[in-house]
Structures are given as C-alpha cells and as structure tokens.
Amino acid sequence: MTDQIRRAARSVGANISEAWGKRRYEAHFISKLTDADGENHEVEHWLITARRDGYLTDAEFTTLLEQKREVGRMLGSMIHKPESFHLK
C-alpha cells in the first residue's frame, strides 16, 4: 500500500511539472493539472484504505488528509485561473 501512496503522490508532482512546461498552451496546462488532481484524489483513497486497515492512526490520517486537501485547493486555484500562469 505504501507503494501506491508514493506512486500517486509522486505523480501529482510529475503532472504539475509537465503542466508548467506546457503552460503557454492553456488546454494542455489545464489537462495536466486535472491529471494531477486525479492522482491527488487517488492519494485520498489510499489514505482511507490505510487507516481502515490499521496502517495509520487517526491523527496521522487527519494530518495527511489535510495536506492532501491543501494540495487540492492549490490545484483547483491553478485550474480555475490558468491565465495567471501563462507566459507573456
């Protein structure tokens, strides 16, 4: 399960990096950020599973889930205001 959480979390960063490299193309930028958001949601799934199966305490789960949600808020802001990130 650790591998799945790590893979999904790393994929969030990889997709953001790819989006940044293509930021001059709004549709591609949004698409890659949307992929990152999907991976971020997968992280939540694995966190819920880890807590359910006893691999995380409630405190650990709460901390990690809040961090995941903060990443989601940042991604949402970037997706909804892509013009703020375009090359001029």
Feature map (PLM): residue ranges:
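Amphipathic alpha-helical assembly/interaction segments
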Residues: 1-88
